[in-house]
Amino acid sequence: MSVQVAAPGSTGLGPERLNPEELVRQTRQVVQGLEALRAEHHSLAGHLAEALAGPGPVAGVELLEEKQQVVNHSLEAIELGLGEAQVLLALSAHVGVLEAEKQRLRAQARRLAQENTWLREELEETQRRLRASEEAVAQLEEEKSHLQFLGQLRQYDPPEESQRPDSPPRRDSLASLFPSEEEEKKGPEAAGAAAAQQGGYEIPARLRTLHNLVIQYASQGRYEVAVPLCRQALEDLERSSGHCHPDVATMLNILALVYRDQNKYKEATELLHDALQIREQTLGPEHPAVAATLNNLAVLYGKRGRYREAEPLCQRALEIREKVLGADHPDVAKQLNNLALLCQNQGKFQDVERHYARALSIYEALGGPQDPNVAKTKNNLASAYLKQNKYQQAEELYKEILSQEALPAPLGAPQGGTAGEAQQQVLRRSSSFSKLRESIRRGSEKLVSRLRGESMAGAAGMKRAMSLNMLNVDGPRAARMQLSTQHLNEASRTLSASTQDLSPR
């Protein structure tokens, strides 16, 4: 006799996929069925035992013993099934506990991960604020020390020309951060001394102070301080005023100045193109600041040897300055000098002579023949004549430069001004005459060498050639020439700012 117990709902065709809850429910039903079968088999085993204990035929006893063995075997199978079912139920309960614990731990891990992310973000924000605070503190300390130093120096300075009622208005501004060739060696104070005079746009004092700091750092070679300082200020301006704002263009010019000093001409050119676009949009295409940026771009292209690209930029800057400032303005003459240098590097000597001649006429009309800019322009024109082998014209220009009977006002006694004012002009022009004298000396050496067919002589021999052979004058004229040369030598030790060639070095 055998009894089979099937799970309710089972078709017997194969295993079915059940979820854990359904499996536990069916296992419990099977346990109940097995317990009922066990009770039934115990009852059968009892009846068989009673039957075997009573008298009966031998054949009947053998049959009863066989049935008893089958029942006992079934009881063993039922007990085994019950044990396995109990184990399954216990395992199911344990798995349920583990699953609940796993879900709890998983939720806790998610919460901890969120808290960790939040803490990381807070830490990064705190570190960023700390770095910004440290940079701000360092910047303020540097600015404080710089301003204290400037304050200590200011008490020894004479009154500035811009503070005297009889002085003409200055047009130096932060709009021209790459000065013209005559202005390139002026100090940072000259570059940031005044606001823009055209279009009603005034450079903020904060940017002028920042520009002075950047110039100071760059002159010391501390570009690792100057560049982050510029970039931080640029980001602050873009956040507060937007990208298309004149102050942003000014800041781009300052950063381009730092890159130019590092000989990173490509990066500086990109920044100046951005500044040019901003100034054209905000100030108009014919604003003096646009002309200054165009001139700066032309200077950069010239330093990179890209003279063809620089020339139209310089030409456009000239047209703007002629229209806004007038055809006889000093800035127009400076622009003509730059344009002449670009043309000279391209071999356009006819244009070079025309531009220098016009610049010379402007300087002579404004300052007379004693204006230092007249001597500089004549020296540049003489150099152009030398490159064309026009030795006679170059000799005449060098004679005019060296034979001036009267020197500029700062070299003699003050005429209608205080000694302090004259000394201030002397200091501003010292490097100008120093470089001019050196340039004239080199040009004269070339001229004498070519005229006489000799090699370049030393400095001592050159002085004799200049006095005896090249000038070829005598009497009072020779004395005046010698006196002028002596004055020019003295000027090289006392006077200031000069031109720089646009050609690459």
Curated annotation (Swiss-Prot):
<feature type="region of interest" description="Disordered">
    <location>
        <begin position="486"/>
        <end position="505"/>
    </location>
</feature>
<feature type="repeat" description="TPR 5">
    <location>
        <begin position="375"/>
        <end position="408"/>
    </location>
</feature>
<dbReference type="GO" id="GO:0008088">
    <property type="term" value="P:axo-dendritic transport"/>
</dbReference>
<keyword id="KW-0206">Cytoskeleton</keyword>
<dbReference type="GO" id="GO:0043005">
    <property type="term" value="C:neuron projection"/>
</dbReference>
<dbReference type="GO" id="GO:0003777">
    <property type="term" value="F:microtubule motor activity"/>
</dbReference>
<dbReference type="GO" id="GO:0008017">
    <property type="term" value="F:microtubule binding"/>
</dbReference>
<feature type="modified residue" description="Phosphoserine">
    <location>
        <position position="173"/>
    </location>
</feature>
<dbReference type="InterPro" id="IPR019734">
    <property type="entry name" value="TPR_rpt"/>
</dbReference>
<comment type="similarity">
    <text>Belongs to the kinesin light chain family.</text>
</comment>
<dbReference type="GO" id="GO:0005871">
    <property type="term" value="C:kinesin complex"/>
</dbReference>
<dbReference type="GO" id="GO:0120317">
    <property type="term" value="P:sperm mitochondrial sheath assembly"/>
</dbReference>
<dbReference type="GO" id="GO:0005737">
    <property type="term" value="C:cytoplasm"/>
</dbReference>
<keyword id="KW-0677">Repeat</keyword>
<feature type="compositionally biased region" description="Polar residues">
    <location>
        <begin position="421"/>
        <end position="434"/>
    </location>
</feature>
<keyword id="KW-0175">Coiled coil</keyword>
<keyword id="KW-0963">Cytoplasm</keyword>
<comment type="subunit">
    <text>Oligomer composed of two heavy chains and two light chains. Associates with microtubulin in an ATP-dependent manner. Interacts with KIF5C. Interacts with ODF1. Interacts with LRGUK. Interacts with VDAC2.</text>
</comment>
<feature type="region of interest" description="Disordered">
    <location>
        <begin position="1"/>
        <end position="20"/>
    </location>
</feature>
<feature type="compositionally biased region" description="Basic and acidic residues">
    <location>
        <begin position="161"/>
        <end position="173"/>
    </location>
</feature>
<feature type="region of interest" description="Disordered">
    <location>
        <begin position="409"/>
        <end position="439"/>
    </location>
</feature>
<dbReference type="GO" id="GO:0019894">
    <property type="term" value="F:kinesin binding"/>
</dbReference>
<keyword id="KW-0802">TPR repeat</keyword>
<feature type="repeat" description="TPR 1">
    <location>
        <begin position="207"/>
        <end position="240"/>
    </location>
</feature>
<feature type="repeat" description="TPR 3">
    <location>
        <begin position="291"/>
        <end position="324"/>
    </location>
</feature>
<dbReference type="GO" id="GO:0035253">
    <property type="term" value="C:ciliary rootlet"/>
</dbReference>
<dbReference type="GO" id="GO:0007286">
    <property type="term" value="P:spermatid development"/>
</dbReference>
<comment type="function">
    <text>Kinesin is a microtubule-associated force-producing protein that may play a role in organelle transport. Plays a role during spermiogenesis in the development of the sperm tail midpiece and in the normal function of spermatozoa. May play a role in the formation of the mitochondrial sheath formation in the developing spermatid midpiece.</text>
</comment>
<feature type="repeat" description="TPR 2">
    <location>
        <begin position="249"/>
        <end position="282"/>
    </location>
</feature>
<feature type="repeat" description="TPR 4">
    <location>
        <begin position="333"/>
        <end position="366"/>
    </location>
</feature>
<dbReference type="GO" id="GO:0007283">
    <property type="term" value="P:spermatogenesis"/>
</dbReference>
<keyword id="KW-0221">Differentiation</keyword>
<feature type="modified residue" description="Phosphoserine">
    <location>
        <position position="503"/>
    </location>
</feature>
<keyword id="KW-0493">Microtubule</keyword>
<keyword id="KW-0496">Mitochondrion</keyword>
<dbReference type="Pfam" id="PF13424">
    <property type="entry name" value="TPR_12"/>
</dbReference>
<dbReference type="InterPro" id="IPR011990">
    <property type="entry name" value="TPR-like_helical_dom_sf"/>
</dbReference>
<dbReference type="GO" id="GO:0005739">
    <property type="term" value="C:mitochondrion"/>
</dbReference>
<keyword id="KW-0744">Spermatogenesis</keyword>
<keyword id="KW-0597">Phosphoprotein</keyword>
<feature type="modified residue" description="Phosphothreonine">
    <location>
        <position position="499"/>
    </location>
</feature>
<feature type="region of interest" description="Disordered">
    <location>
        <begin position="154"/>
        <end position="197"/>
    </location>
</feature>
